[in-house]
């Protein structure tokens, strides 16, 4: 296992020097029949990458392939011995080709991993493909050269757990290398999954990812994604043994809190990000922490958004009404803020942007009624009556939400002191006056603390079979 250790936050693209003789040195303390190489690092490692006081070291147990034979580092350090970990079959003599990291494939085959777990100031284990070649002479030096290129980056956003690097050309996979540190792909991958060692990227650390250099003269399209969304992209050329600095990667999020009405029927939610009619991207939204606020990663270069209520039985995101049930108006993305869908509206209601913290504690100032089948007879309409508080009494006419639920916005001064009780009233379909003269049936005096105290019930259901129901009702926090 090779570690790249730094005294300061700097990157290194390695050139290794190993030592070899055509007639091998034999350590008197080594097992009979063993072959040893001494590996160290030359000055090019530092000058090529402007490394400041850093060093590259082997770690005990590192494995390399020399002419297809496995050799293992018997100690850690900048200059260590490698000893054959298996007995060579047939002749084992120069010329020699050495490859890191070791694979059991053909002698000149190696693999740049498609998943790399990175840590501050260093590469992922076994991610830096290197090669050395010697014709055979009295000198005992093998110079390892990088086949890989390196991407340096930081993550500016807290909480990011995974990035995916993708390209129009291969970035990783199984490769066949030659003595000049060139390569051909035998089983390539156009993506590399990058994960932090500690589970979450730190915003204060620098990370490095090893990638294959760009083949050919043309640049390649390159993108950095998280949660399937591109957050940074460009047209680049990766060069062997050099660094491409991706600088700071910012993952932008936007948020939406649906109304209780929108949450009827357990929909899913999606965000439609766009620049114009031709440049757009659908992104699924999630509420992983169950706080009622849904999140989406903002794609690079798309400054506008429409939040959509979607059919949960269909995963397709488009404007077909079988899939998209309801939508907001066109909005400018407010990074880090949450859009609150206006209560009692289905489409294009004038919602409000809130800070994320406020959105998480937001409660609609609305009360809902779910009448039973008795109450819905004879085309009755419904009202709420606030009373027994310091603000006197107030009648509120309730409007149908979807034929099952009825709702009305409460006064701005509503609390359990100003209005201690609420009475739900079934009203005569032949009358329009908002008073007791239009009453057919009613609930009892219900405590408003049901709505003002946690768990903040907002919907009152008249229990089945009831007419004048007293307190025979069921309160719920959602419309169900």
Task: Tell where the protein language model's regions lie, with residue ranges.
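Insoluble glucan recognition modules
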Residues: 28-30, 37-39, 53, 171, ...
